[in-house]
C-alpha cells in the first residue's frame, strides 16, 4: 500500500511512534495540517518512507509503502501528544511561528514555550509596565526600540528574547499593531545564533519528556552540531 503526502514547508509535521502492548501492533500517529492520521501494523513489518523537499512548490513530500494488512484511521482536530522531529533550522521556524501568532498557536511545543513567561517576569517584573513605560512599544518607533532592547540579550539567552518577543507580539495584536508581529518574528528568528538554540531545544526536550515542569530551568546541555535531528517522546500517551 503506497502513500504520498505533500505539506507546505512552513507547516510542522508531528508524529508519535510507539508499540501498543494492548493491540500488539506498532502505531504511528501523524498530524498534518490539523488532520490526524493513525496507522497500525504488526511490529515485524517494515515501513519504507522517503522524505524530500520540493523547492518548486516549497513543500515537504513524504512517500512510502505500508504493509498490506494496515489499519489507517483519520480524524480532524483531535488533540494528541506527539513526537516532534526538527533540526535547528526548522526550530527557528517554530520560534518564529510562536512569536508571530502567540494568541492562536496551540500544541505541546507552544505550551512549553509559554512557561518561559515566568522567567521573564522574574527578571523584569511587571511586563505591561516594561512595555508601556520603559520601552513604549506602542509608539511610532516601538518596534525599533524593542529590537534595540533585546539585541544584547539574544546572544546570551535566547529564551528571554523569545519570551519577550512573543509577549510583545501578543500585546500588539490586542492593540491593532498586528503588522509588526511578522516583521519582529522574522528578525528575531534570523538573529538568534544557531549555537544559542541548543539550550532552549534541550530544555524543551526535557520538559516534553516530563522531566521538568517548565523550560526555564538551567540544564547541562551539549552542542549537537553533528546531529541535525532532535526527537522528543511524550510518554504520557504511550504504553511503551
Curated annotation (Swiss-Prot):
The keyword Repeat does not apply. Disulfide bonds: none annotated. Induction: Expressed in the early phase of the viral replicative cycle. Transmembrane segments: none annotated. Pfam families: Poxv_Bcl-2-like (PF06227). Signal peptide: none annotated. Keywords: Early protein, Host-virus interaction, Inhibition of host innate immune response by virus, Inhibition of host IRF3 by virus, Inhibition of host NF-kappa-B by virus, Inhibition of host RLR pathway by virus, Viral immunoevasion. GO terms for biological process: symbiont-mediated suppression of host cytoplasmic pattern recognition receptor signaling pathway via inhibition of IRF3 activity; symbiont-mediated suppression of host NF-kappaB cascade. The keyword RNA-binding does not apply. It comes from the Viruses. Tetramer. Interacts with host MYD88, TRF4, TICAM2 and MAL. Belongs to the orthopoxvirus OPG176 family. BCL2-like protein which disrupts the host immune response by inhibiting the TLR4 signaling pathway leading to NF-kappa-B activation. Acts close to the plasma membrane and targets several host TIR-domain containing adapter proteins including MYD88, TIRAP, TRIF and TICAM2. In turn, blocks the host NF-kappa-B and TRIF-mediated IRF3 activation. This is Protein OPG176. The lineage of its organism: Viruses, Varidnaviria, Bamfordvirae, Nucleocytoviricota, Pokkesviricetes. The gene is OPG176.
Amino acid at each position: 500500500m503506497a502513500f504520498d503526502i505533500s505539506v507546505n514547508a512552513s507547516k510542522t509535521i508531528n508524529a508519535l511512534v510507539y508499540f501498543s502492548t494492548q493491540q500488539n501492533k506498532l502505531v504511528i500517529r501523524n498530524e498534518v495540517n490539523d488532520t490526524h492520521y493513525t496507522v497500525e501494523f504488526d511490529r515485524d513489518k517494515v515501513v519504507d518512507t522517503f522524505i524530500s523537499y520540493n523547492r518548486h512548490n516549497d513543500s515537504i513530500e513524504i512517500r512510502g509503502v505500508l504493509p498490506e494488512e494496515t489499519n489507517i484511521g483519520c480524524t480532524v482536530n483531535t488533540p494528541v501528544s506527539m513526537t516532534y522531529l526538527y533540526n535547528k533550522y526548522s526550530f527557528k521556524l517554530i520560534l518564529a511561528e510562536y512569536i508571530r501568532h502567540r494568541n492562536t498557536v496551540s500544541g505541546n511545543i507552544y505550551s512549553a514555550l509559554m512557561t518561559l513567561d515566568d522567567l521573564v517576569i522574574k527578571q523584569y517584573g511587571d511586563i505591561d509596565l516594561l512595555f508601556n513605560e520603559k520601552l513604549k512599544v506602542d509608539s511610532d518607533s516601538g518596534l525599533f526600540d524593542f529590537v534595540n532592547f533585546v539585541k544584547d540579550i539574544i546572544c546570551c539567552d535566547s529564551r528571554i528574547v523569545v519570551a519577550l518577543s512573543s509577549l510583545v507580539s501578543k500585546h500588539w495584536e490586542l492593540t491593532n499593531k498586528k503588522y509588526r508581529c511578522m516583521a519582529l518574528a522574522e528578525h528575531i528568528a534570523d538573529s538568534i545564533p544557531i549555537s544559542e538554540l541548543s539550550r532552549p531545544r534541550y530544555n524543551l526536550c526535557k520538559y516534553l519528556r516530563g522531566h521538568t515542569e517548565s523550560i526555564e530551568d538551567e540544564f547541562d546541555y551539549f552542542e549537537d552540531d553533528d546531529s541535525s535531528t532532535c526527537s522528543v517522546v511524550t510518554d504520557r500517551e504511550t504504553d511503551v
